[in-house]
């Protein structure tokens, strides 16, 4: 006599950032904690801590709760100061209340971990 097991298989859900990374074939997984600042006019700034989840030689991909829009200017800084770069939002993907963001560096970052 056979019995049938029932239960849910554990399925790891793909992050919203991983879904966006599919549009960037050069994207490599990384895990870099950063301070993200949205650079706005007239001294207004919005900041948050986030983690860069994917990188290419020119772009970074991360999740954000800030109200970001296409072409917004961002500043990315890590805690030890080895990363301090400006980037511009080039893609946004909204998924279940979270926003995946791709931003392109505005200048070459000489010590960026992802090389061509």
Regions found by a protein language model. Give the residues of each.
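Structured alpha-helical
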Residues: 1-116
């Amino acid at each position: 006599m056979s019995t049938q097991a029932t239960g849910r298989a554990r399925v790891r859900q793909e992050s919203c950032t991983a879904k966006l990374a599919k549009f960037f074939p050069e994207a490599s997984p990384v895990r870099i904690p950063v301070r993200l600042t949205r650079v706005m006019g007239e001294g207004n700034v919005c900041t948050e801590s986030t983690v860069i989840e994917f990188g290419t030689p020119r772009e970074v991909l991360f999740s954000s709760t800030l109200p970001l829009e296409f072409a917004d200017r961002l500043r990315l800084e890590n805690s030890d100061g080895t990363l301090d770069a400006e980037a511009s939002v080039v893609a946004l993907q909204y998924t279940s209340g979270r926003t995946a963001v791709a931003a392109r560096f505005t200048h070459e970052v000489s010590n960026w971990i992802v090389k061509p």
